[in-house]
């Protein structure tokens, strides 16, 4: 027999799913709108520890999945982590990569990440839309950041020339951000290698996909 607490949890989950379905249908008839956030807003939020919840246990699955893809497909390679924040993904990647470079537009977030810098791990303040990596990489990761760009497809395409041969792009997006339009555009432009949908018991869910930089359909 279902307990009251479990019934409430299930009701919450179904409500989230219904709300997401409505959002996705409405999105099909609306122009794409990115989440425009200024650097100082990011800095203020990180100073106020407003993003600390990203380190909660219910956020772990997407980080672990990205790390798993890199461990399986590009072990011992170089990683560019776009929008790295305080470097939570880097912690999951420790021991997997040869070189890691995390970039973020927030100075404050990188203050928290930089204590983990070493000879193979670096963090830089940069605008991802125009950043030029100092070396070619095996994998570029966009972990919950692509919907902050006004032109997300151009940003992904920007990094093509900085990927090594058979390099990969790994993208994670949370469903509450209604990224349907972005996923559709990516599938039309880039070659899919693999993908998975992750759902936590709280109702949070993400899609993580791996694209390859090779092929005529990569713009």
Q: Which residues fall in each region the model found?
A:
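Core SAM-dependent methyltransferase catalytic element
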Residues: 199-219
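Conserved class I S-adenosyl-L-methionine
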Residues: 4-71, 76-85, 177
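A short glycine-rich, Lys/Arg-flanked "PGG" loop and its adjoining helix->strand segment in the class I
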Residues: 155-165
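Conserved beta-strand signature within the Rossmann-like core of class I S-adenosyl-L-methionine
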Residues: 166-174
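A short acidic, Gly/Pro-enriched loop at the edge of an enzyme's catalytic core
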Residues: 132-140
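Class I SAM-dependent methyltransferase SAM/SAH-binding core
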Residues: 86-130
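A short SAM/SAH-binding and catalytic strip from SAM-dependent methyltransferases
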Residues: 139-151
């Amino acid at each position: 027999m279902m307990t009251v607490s479990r019934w409430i949890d299930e009701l919450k989950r179904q409500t989230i799913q219904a709300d997401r379905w409505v959002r996705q249908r409405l999105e099909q008839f609306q122009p794409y709108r990115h989440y425009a956030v200024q650097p100082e807003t990011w800095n203020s939020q990180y100073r106020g520890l407003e993003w600390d919840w990203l380190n909660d246990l219910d956020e772990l699955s997407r980080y672990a999945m990205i790390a798993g893809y890199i461990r399986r497909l590009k072990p011992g390679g170089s990683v560019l982590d776009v929008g790295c924040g305080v470097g939570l993904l880097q912690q999951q990647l420790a021991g997997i990569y040869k070189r890691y470079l995390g970039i973020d537009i927030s100075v404050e977030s990188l203050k928290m990440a930089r204590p983990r810098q070493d000879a193979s791990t670096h963090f830089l303040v940069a605008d991802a839309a125009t950043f030029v990596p100092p070396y070619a990489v095996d994998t570029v990761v966009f972990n919950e950041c692509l919907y902050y760009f006004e032109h997300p497809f151009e940003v992904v395409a920007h990094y093509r020339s900085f990927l090594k041969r058979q390099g990969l792009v790994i993208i994670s997006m949370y469903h509450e951000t209604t990224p349907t339009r972005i996923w559709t555009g990516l599938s039309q432009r880039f070659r899919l290698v693999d993908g998975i949908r992750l759902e936590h018991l709280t109702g949070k869910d993400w899609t993580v996909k791996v694209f390859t930089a090779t092929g005529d359909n990569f713009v």
